[in-house]
Amino acid sequence: MIPVLNVNWQSPEADYSLSERDTDLLALIETEDLATFTFDGLKRRTGLHSETLSRILSRLEEEGIIKKEPCGYRVTTKITELKLQTPRKETPSTPLMQTYLPSDLKTQQLILNLEGKWFGMLRWLGISENNQGVTLKWITEDGAIQIAANIQGTALNIEAKFLTSNNLNLALKASYQLMSLIGKLCISTQATRPAVAQNAGYFGGSLMSA
């Protein structure tokens, strides 16, 4: 089993009947700042058995911390009532690509088109929204690498978290699969500017430009 997170737990003021495993999963959801997520994505991310994860999510749903929806789960504001301390060990993100989306592209439509998509070696995990924009998250089929695409204005940043594998080549291949999909969506949603990027930076020892 892939360990979720090494966290400290303090009993919240609200009366929640949660186990240590429940709070570990909540710590992961909070650390990833997930607003929505899928069962399959979380299963791959944590390595938990399907029945174990199902029981945990059922308890969290009973407590009103998450809400089941047709496309997965949505995190409610009740998660803010839990006093989860910052994890002592957190997987750092590695930047892979920086690029720009066309300024006349409707980014909200692009996000809607990307949300929930499975493609190539990537499986959908979830989405987060904060003052740093919208971040869409995928995980490789084997749960080894997490890929995130952050969209803030016209800026697009793609990063990786190496969970159980340090295979940079695999992460780069996954990020190019993501960029290929984004390119196709950009072309299909606007006829005036078929080019996806104005400039592209590659963090692997070389610099490329479009």
Language-model-detected regions and their locations in the chain:
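Short amphipathic alpha-helical interaction segments
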Residues: 47-62
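Short Lys/Arg-enriched alpha/beta "domain-start" segment
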Residues: 84-135
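Short acidic, hydrophobic short linear motifs in intrinsically disordered regions
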Residues: 34-45
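Short, cationic-aromatic polyanion-contact patches
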Residues: 8-22, 38, 71-89
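Charged, low-complexity intrinsically disordered regulatory/assembly segments
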Residues: 120-210
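Basic, low-complexity segments
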Residues: 1-7
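A short, conserved structural fragment
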Residues: 61-71
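Short amphipathic alpha-helical interface segments
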Residues: 19-35
